[in-house]
Amino acid sequence: MAKTLYEKLFDAHVVYEAENETPLLYIDRHLVHEVTSPQAFDGLRTHGRPVRQPGKTFATMDHNVSTQTKDINACGEMARIQMQELIKNCKEFGVELYDLNHPYQGIVHVMGPEQGVTLPGMTIVCGDSHTATHGAFGALAFGIGTSEVEHVLATQTLKQGRAKTMKIEVQGKAAPGITAKDIVLAIIGKTGSAGGTGHVVEFCGEAIRDLSMEGRMTLCNMAIEMGAKAGLVAPDETTFNYVKGRLHAPKGKDFDDAVAYWKTLQTDEGATFDTVVTLQAEEISPQVTWGTNPGQVISVNDNIPDPASFADPVERASAEKALAYMGLKPGIPLTEVAIDKVFIGSCTNSRIEDLRAAAEIAKGRKVAPGVQALVVPGSGPVKAQAEAEGLDKIFIEAGFEWRLPGCSMCLAMNNDRLNPGERCASTSNRNFEGRQGRGGRTHLVSPAMAAAAAVTGHFADIRNIK
């Protein structure tokens, strides 16, 4: 029987399945950070259990770390306790930890792929909703809760029901300057923020194959923002070339054998999906969210929509509420909306290609008066690579702040946050009320679009800037 990629990955990891029971899956990789793990380790300690597979468990600090100093006291008492607990727990249970002084420290979903921890064909979990990022490699990756973190630590397995399948095909070639972020925002604009609920999404089509691994990670990172359980891109030569030579990737003949298997990780011809969505890449322009969920998104050259234009009463009410919170009026051009802060970073857009794209816009320009702009590399290696290329100097000369790795202003769990009423052009993944700080107003954009907003002081079409 013809199978989708998701069905192949799921079936390959079923350890035990009894009739009328939820299947038990084997977990190949478990990624851990300081926020969702303390209670899980406490549970192991209480029951006298070890970590079953410490060699398949990798930890880093990211969510509430300071991006201005490596001092764990810098972000308050709760952050300090969580980081100290992670240090203690990893030492006690034999888990490898990339702490603040480790050269590989960074956002968990940047670190995993970078170190070859993430490989095609794997099941990967983490106590974080954006674990879907790793699906870019043709891995089944999804976020889990703290009680599930404990279960995986103790057993290296997890009970998971089968999801429905969705194919999202982006046909044709994207125009120059259109990034994975624009593509995924356009997709969510079409499906809505709940369009993928109950599904695992496979992204395919020429525009997807044209993306680098970094672009594919951006795409899969935001699968959760359309309500999906996970996002997938089938592995290909782009994937294999990225993985080859990385720290935890197979070497020599083992790598060749792995690639032979990875090449089978494609949806079979004739396999059926529960839902199919199609977009034309050439119709996608630079995207900017205007509301309080990622599905409330328009082209940079559009006007703020009128809630009255929504036929669905629920959408209409949501739009009215969003505009009130965002302090926007219907009908005004998005390019006239001024911003206060810019955040370039997060597990969505903090990799080297993202920073290069932003630096290309920033080069030779200055951050607009009254705007604070942060650039936060996703990991130690990204920061080092950017500095080797001189990107840090470009940003600093333009008036951006060049920070240490961490989740930073993506979420209000550290010192980087918005004040009430402040408007931010952000390369992160969520624009809910208060996501970047109580009363903060978040607009999601690509790195180049964020840099353009920084130097102009408002939203601007990068195609007109270059």
Curated annotation (Swiss-Prot):
It is an enzyme of class 4 (lyase). This is 3-isopropylmalate dehydratase large subunit. GO terms for biological process: L-leucine biosynthetic process. InterPro entries: 3-IsopropMal_deHydase_lsu (IPR004430), Acnase/IPM_dHydase_lsu_aba_1/3 (IPR015931), Acoase/IPM_deHydtase_lsu_aba (IPR001030), Aconitase_4Fe-4S_BS (IPR018136), Aconitase_4Fe-4S_dom (IPR036008), IPM_dehydratase_rel_enz (IPR050067), IPMI_cat (IPR033941). Its cofactor is [4Fe-4S] cluster. [4Fe-4S] cluster binds at residues 347, 407, 410. Heterodimer of LeuC and LeuD. Belongs to the aconitase/IPM isomerase family. LeuC type 1 subfamily. One of its GO terms (molecular function) is 4 iron, 4 sulfur cluster binding. Disulfide bonds: none annotated. Catalyzes the isomerization between 2-isopropylmalate and 3-isopropylmalate, via the formation of 2-isopropylmaleate. Pathway: Amino-acid biosynthesis; L-leucine biosynthesis; L-leucine from 3-methyl-2-oxobutanoate: step 2/4. PANTHER family: 3-ISOPROPYLMALATE DEHYDRATASE, HOMOACONITASE, MITOCHONDRIAL-RELATED. Keywords: 4Fe-4S, Amino-acid biosynthesis, Branched-chain amino acid biosynthesis, Iron, Iron-sulfur, Leucine biosynthesis, Lyase, Metal-binding. HAMAP family: LeuC_type1. It comes from Escherichia coli (strain 55989 / EAEC). It catalyses: (2R,3S)-3-isopropylmalate = (2S)-2-isopropylmalate. Its EC number is 4.2.1.33. The keyword Plastid does not apply. The gene is leuC. Binds 1 [4Fe-4S] cluster per subunit. It comes from the Bacteria.
